[in-house]
């Protein structure tokens, strides 16, 4: 029995891809495979001011290490700040021992004679520890007002910080990491039509409600007036084998885009891996358990679109009759008959080694008369 041959490629984010505005330009993909933006923002006027105006979003987007550092520094800073204020109150009222108060003197805050004592009183008051060793007397109405102000301000601060922590934890970002796109898109015939296909799977048992997959074709475009648009965006529609607009994503599904005369992909040289474009895929849905909107993104470059392949079936039945989704087969593709009706352009920019190797594999498959599985992985 002939063994199945597999070929692995290493694909990094920094690639020698086709130029946007001319030959010889190195560029990175606009969107990484895991959905992160590769766009760098520069020369934004008053950027810091704009971020400070929207503190809520700024704190939520902040990385955890900076958030924890800011959280600790904020509490320690307020304890010390109000500790200094309590110390100044004690100085103004003559409560310090070095000021030699009279024997019948009643301090504003009992047992606060040093800056350290004032700091401890501030900490105990703000955290509502209340050891009882240091306490406010009725001698100073100003001290009572100061205590109320400290508790109100720090409570508001605690609510804000706690809210940003909870909002960051509750974001559906981690839920999006359990939605998986296939590493490659494939082009083959489906129901007698040439189709570009991608595979999507939900790796949790909880469902996504109202799933929709949309695509954006990013490429250089020249208008009739001669204007060059560096990243022109064109909608690419995807569908599944169902009449519903919201697929039931309980098992891995294959989404199809029919490459016909109305398709924005019809003039692209998909077979040769040639061209300067990027296909961005976006899956949107509602998380069943939290009702939060979740969005997952990925992108495909020309060399990540395989011509004349289809996905290996990844769903099977166990001996007990249960459905099994085998994710070891999720990214595997198998050679099939090439679809007809699509452009077959001469290779100009394709990776010569890759194309030569794939051609030799096709010839080997024809000689052996067996299906050839080619898997190209990103690392």
Swiss-Prot record:
Its main location: membrane. Changing residue 175 to Q: In SESAMES; likely pathogenic; results in decreased potassium ion import across the plasma membrane when mutant channels are expressed in a heterologous system; results in decreased channel activity and a shift to a more alkaline pH for activation. ATP binds at residues 210-217. Disulfide bonds join 108-140. Residues 115-131 dip into the membrane without crossing it. Residues 89-114, 132-140 are extracellular. It is a multi-pass membrane protein. The record marks 158 as: Role in the control of polyamine-mediated channel gating and in the blocking by intracellular magnesium. InterPro entries: Ig_E-set, IRK_C, K_chnl_inward-rec_Kir, K_chnl_inward-rec_Kir1.2, K_chnl_inward-rec_Kir_cyto, Kir_TM. Keywords: ATP-binding, Cell membrane, Deafness, Disease variant, Disulfide bond, Epilepsy, Intellectual disability, Ion channel, Ion transport, Membrane, Nucleotide-binding, Potassium, Potassium transport, Transmembrane, Transmembrane helix, Transport, Voltage-gated channel. GO terms for molecular function: ATP binding; ATP-activated inward rectifier potassium channel activity; inward rectifier potassium channel activity. It is linked to Seizures, sensorineural deafness, ataxia, impaired intellectual development, and electrolyte imbalance: A complex disorder characterized by generalized seizures with onset in infancy, delayed psychomotor development, ataxia, sensorineural hearing loss, hypokalemia, metabolic alkalosis, and hypomagnesemia. This is ATP-sensitive inward rectifier potassium channel 10. The gene is KCNJ10.
């Amino acid at each position: 029995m002939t063994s199945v041959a597999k070929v692995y490629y290493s694909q990094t984010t920094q690639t020698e891809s086709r130029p946007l505005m001319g030959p010889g330009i190195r560029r990175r993909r606009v969107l990484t495979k895991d959905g992160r933006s590769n766009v760098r923002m520069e020369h934004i006027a008053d950027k810091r001011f704009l971020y400070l105006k929207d503190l809520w979003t700024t704190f939520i987007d902040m990385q955890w290490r900076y958030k924890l550092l800011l959280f600790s520094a904020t509490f320690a800073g307020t304890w010390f700040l109000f500790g200094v204020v309590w110390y100044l109150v004690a100085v103004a009222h003559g409560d310090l021992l070095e000021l030699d108060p009279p024997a019948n003197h009643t301090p504003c805050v009992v047992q606060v004679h040093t800056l350290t004592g004032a700091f401890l009183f501030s900490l105990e008051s703000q955290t509502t520890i209340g050891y009882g060793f240091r306490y406010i007397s009725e001698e100073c109405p100003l001290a009572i007002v100061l205590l109320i102000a400290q508790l109100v301000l720090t409570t508001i601060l605690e609510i804000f910080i706690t809210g940003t922590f909870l909002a960051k934890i509750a974001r559906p970002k981690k839920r999006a990491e359990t939605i998986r796109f296939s590493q490659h898109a494939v082009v083959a015939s489906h129901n007698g039509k040439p189709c570009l296909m991608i595979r999507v799977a939900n790796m949790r048992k909880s469902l996504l409600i109202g799933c929709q997959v949309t695509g954006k074709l990013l490429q250089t475009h020249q208008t009739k007036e001669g204007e060059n648009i560096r990243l022109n965006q064109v909608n690419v529609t995807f569908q599944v084998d169902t009449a519903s607009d919201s697929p039931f994503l309980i098992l891995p599904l294959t989404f199809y885009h029919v490459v016909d005369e109305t398709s924005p992909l019809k003039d692209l040289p998909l077979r040769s891996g040639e061209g300067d474009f990027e296909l961005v895929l976006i899956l949107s849905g509602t998380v069943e358990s939290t009702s939060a909107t979740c969005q997952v993104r990925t992108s495909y470059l020309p060399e990540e679109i395989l011509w004349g392949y289809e996905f290996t079936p990844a769903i099977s039945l166990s001996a007990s009759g249960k459905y099994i989704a085998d994710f070891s087969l999720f990214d595997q593709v198998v050679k099939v008959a090439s679809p007809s009706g699509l452009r077959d352009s001469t290779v100009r920019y394709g990776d010569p080694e890759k194309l030569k190797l794939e051609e030799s594999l096709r010839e080997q498959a024809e000689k052996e008369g067996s299906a050839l599985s080619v898997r190209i992985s990103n690392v």
